[in-house]
Amino acid sequence: MESGNIVNAQPKLSGIIDGSKSYMYEQLWKLCAGPLCDIPKLGENVYYFPQGNIELVQASTREELNELQPICDLPSKLQCRVIAIHLKVENNSDEIYAEITLMPDTTQVVIPTQSENRFRPLVNSFTKVLTASDTSAYGGFSVPKKHAIECLPPLDMSQPLPAQEILAIDLHDNQWRFRHNYRGTPQRHSLTTGWNEFITSKKLVKGDVIVFVRGETGELRVGIRRARHQQGNIPSSIVSIDCMRHGVIASAKHAFDNQCIFIVVYKPRSSQFIVSYDKFLDAVNNKFNVGSRFTMRFEGDDFSERRYFGTIIGVSDFSPHWKCSEWRSLEVQWDEFASFSRPNKVSPWEIEHLVPALNVPRSSLLKNKRLREVNEFGSSSSHLLPPILTQGQEIGQLSVASPMNISLRYRDTTEAAMNPSRLLMSYPVQPMPKLNYNNQMVTQIEENITTKAGTNFRLFGVTLDTPPMIKDPIKQIGSDISKLTERKKFGQSQTLRSPIEIQSKQFSSSRTCTKVQMQGVTIGRAVDLSVLNGYDQLILELEKLFDIKGQLQTRNQWKIAFTDSDGYEMLVGDDPWPEFCKMVKKILIYSKEEVKNLKSSKSLSS
């Protein structure tokens, strides 16, 4: 090929993704790219969006469009055919990227594609987020036992101190030698000698990810993935000075007018601007309207795939110069706060339409009522509300009502999102329940409580009640506790303590609860494993929390998984119950289809 981006329309085609790279290289590259990286297939019909390419190259997308669009009359999208794909890695930073060769509107060029039946060896792999200990100068790399057995060459466990030297190859074909040990108290797998040289050379820090891949022949590959805050838009060595000077639009315009191929650089974590033809049509046919609910996949700070829910609040052009373009045409509002920045305008193919569940019981909706205190960007909005409205309850955690607890009127966020006009309407709802000293939800006892008439006022059309005055609240709490103790006898004797001690105990016990998240349900729950005696009781409790009686026991529709302290996801049931309670950090309920997808991407261990 020539040095420029534009070459002859009939190049010599190899018919494979990258003939100079091995299958192991390809697998390692994809793992380093992450679960959300979507590379088109060779010979596939795609739509190319110049706006997205400019986003990758230039930080100021709109300014670049304003300067170049009057000169180059280029459509907002080009229908192309994928001619070649080269998976590459930047020499200095180890940033991975793909060079994708496209041909506009080419139907006459025959592309020899890969055989679908070609031999694909089995590979084992694992990824781990580096800890402070992993990156310290005097430590080593701690390998989880399961991954050490599956992905590293086997040790001779008959030796008093099993150890051996292993050889791993990175994406630059550089060889790295590590000493694999199994020792310590308790014994654990670790990489010591050679590890410090590796992290120093790669400039790895806490939060980065290490990737190991091992093939059937024993070949071991190693790669890295840098944390989000360390990644720039695009390495300067990738984009030539000539390309930056003439701009992406000029290159695409020349290829479009002359029917010749052009090369674009695609980088993982960037918005998808090369979209398969079928995926684009499916997205457009979904007809996303204002008020439609959707879910979108993101990569979290721990490099795991997460889904966030939102509502479409507008449909408009992202740039005034590119009329009727689907690129970032949907203005969205997110349901919940995230620790990383999310776009307020997305493209239709980036999201999935969320069909509302019409058969959800009313009792389930009542459980989901809460007061939202944090806006999309995480800034507190409590300065807009009176003090009585800033005592919200965080989902998935238990909160304790103080002696001066008040009843609040709060909104159903699910109903409000589906019908924005109701945001300015007031309607009565059930008061928030309080917690008794045994962490059981009870109805507020109103006997023997003398109140003063409160004053009603309105804020944004919502009627608010001033808190009633309670006479002698400490005495009242003691009376309430006595009545509850007589009503329900516990398995072990309990000594009544002062209200301050009881409230302290409530906060302490709330930390023993485990967060539960169900696919398709925005609001999470919490379950106390210490009061359960096994998996059967856990299943019954989860069914009760999400109002899906009998659906978890059959396991035909839903599967239960969990994450451990290392962040790995596994299906429940394989570990003894006491051991499961010690290592579980979060419980997840996935659909059967989602479990299959996670297993295929090796994000979930069976």
Swiss-Prot record:
GO terms for biological process: auxin-activated signaling pathway; regulation of DNA-templated transcription. Residues 126-228 bind DNA. Gene3D superfamilies: 2.30.30.1040, DNA-binding pseudobarrel domain, Phosphatidylinositol 3-kinase Catalytic Subunit, Chain A, domain 1. Residues 511-592 form the PB1 domain. InterPro entries: ARF_dom (IPR010525), ARF_plant (IPR044835), AUX/IAA_dom (IPR033389), B3_DNA-bd (IPR003340), DNA-bd_pseudobarrel_sf (IPR015300), PB1-like (IPR053793). Its main location: nucleus. The keyword Phosphoprotein does not apply. The keyword tRNA-binding does not apply. Pfam families: ARF_AD, AUX_IAA, B3. It is found in: Nucleus. Disulfide bonds: none annotated. One of its GO terms (cellular component) is nucleus. One of its GO terms (molecular function) is DNA binding. Interactions between auxin response factors (ARFs) and Aux/IAA proteins occur through their C-terminal dimerization domains III and IV. Belongs to the ARF family. This is Putative auxin response factor 21.
